């Protein structure tokens, strides 16, 4: 890599970081983007089943639970088999998962995900047999069945193998039919609960004020930092859909504490708009020490009584980049970026600088390393 290329990449990374950190007016979002109404949520369903029709890529005999499942299934159909003679190479035991919305009614269809449970190498071309889908209460809420759709393939021979994506997980769009609805009488509620995704008092109170302004009274109140209770106005009792539609689209401007998030594995740094730094002097330089061993070999002449002698020789070179001492007083993020650019800091250098600023008490933000 040439010097010009290194400089260009460093400049491009710092320019991108500067653009991301530019101060900008806070943007309004809808309430439904930062909160959810209590009770209006999906319910997870899970089931155990068999996928058949695999071309020799199914489970091996070591997957004893697959053989037991085959024996039980055939026994229910009135077919007696010797389990010692069953070879499940065309069958795979799978776990089937899906999420059922609270609004789902009998006859509704759900997309399902099918994942191999045993040692099958591929589910390509398989068909899921009828599988009961149960909730956490042990009741059956849906039945799943159908051919799998995979987003990859796998092929191998004696000396080579080709694979794209994962072939042991597949999906069946609309593969489950709802047989039982979740008991939930939506329109009979006289009180609603709003769960905030943003843990911030200012944002929660802003939501309360917006709700009360829209409903024309003190119907909403904050229970805690992340919960808002809403008393249903008399005009909407028994018909909550119009009320919910109007409330969830109200605009608010979320607030959040100053935070800097650092991903050391990738060198990614995300700085919030509220981050400030006190007046501080920053200098950042790299000290590079290279130790190289060059042993010297003394070889005597042929047929001489001398012995070969190896003399160790170590060369040590130290090189340190000269960086300027920069005084930064970060009233804004742009000043922080400009100051770091002036000392030639790369995004990975920024991680070390931010850690040091936090230790010195000059960074007024929460520093989170992931």
Swiss-Prot record:
Gene Ontology MF annotations: structural molecule activity
Protein localization: Periplasm; Bacterial flagellum basal body
Residues spanning the signal sequence: 1-28
Protein's GO biological process: bacterial-type flagellum-dependent cell motility
Keyword Flavoprotein: no
The entry's keywords: Bacterial flagellum, Periplasm, Signal
A Gene Ontology term for the protein's cellular component: bacterial-type flagellum basal body, distal rod, P ring
Pfam family, one: FlgI
Subunit text: The basal body constitutes a major portion of the flagellar organelle and consists of four rings (L,P,S, and M) mounted on a central rod.
HAMAP family: FlgI
UniProt function note: Assembles around the rod to form the L-ring and probably protects the motor/basal body from shearing forces during rotation.
Entry's family note: Belongs to the FlgI family.
Descriptive protein name: Flagellar P-ring protein
